[in-house]
Amino acid sequence: MLLEKNELTAGSTWHAAGNVPNFAGSWAVMNMQRYGAKMYRTLGEDVDYPMNYHVTGAIRLAHSKERMQEFERVAGMGRYQGLQMDICTPAELKELNPFMETHDLAGGLWDPLDGDIDPAQLTQALAKGARDEGGR
């Protein structure tokens, strides 16, 4: 069920950032995000609706040893779920993004499968798929 004001994407949908992360501190949330990202890759084609979905990758930065430990735990969960999440040293981060200032970083996490999607297009594609299957 989707609740919107007056028509689809007229309410809060168009305000959404459209981030499609894999990173999550919870196994269940990571699993749902992984499922969604996989679905978005083919959704436009599956329902014959144009979609702007981009797999851009994302770097998460750690300024402390504790944050790096969290990244290591999350990366382990991700790898177990079939995701590629790489723990990076400050030097490796600099290789990924030469303009990054790394002097105060403990390291980071690189997720090449993070991305973004147009929230309005996503909503319309999901609605079209539902209508095609008899939804109203």
In which residue ranges do the predicted regions lie?
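Dinucleotide-binding Rossmann-like beta1-alpha1 core, especially the glycine-rich loop
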Residues: G18-L96
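FAD-binding beta-loop-beta segment adjacent to the flavin cofactor pocket
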Residues: T9, K94-T102
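Alpha-helix N-cap/helix-start motif
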Residues: A10-T13, S64, F71, P119
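Short beta-to-alpha linker loops that shape the active-site pocket of alpha/beta-hydrolase fold enzymes
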Residues: N6-L8, L93, L126
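Glycine-rich FAD pyrophosphate-binding loop
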Residues: M1-A16
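Hydrophobic packing within well-folded, soluble alpha/beta domains
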Residues: M1-L2, L93, L109, A130
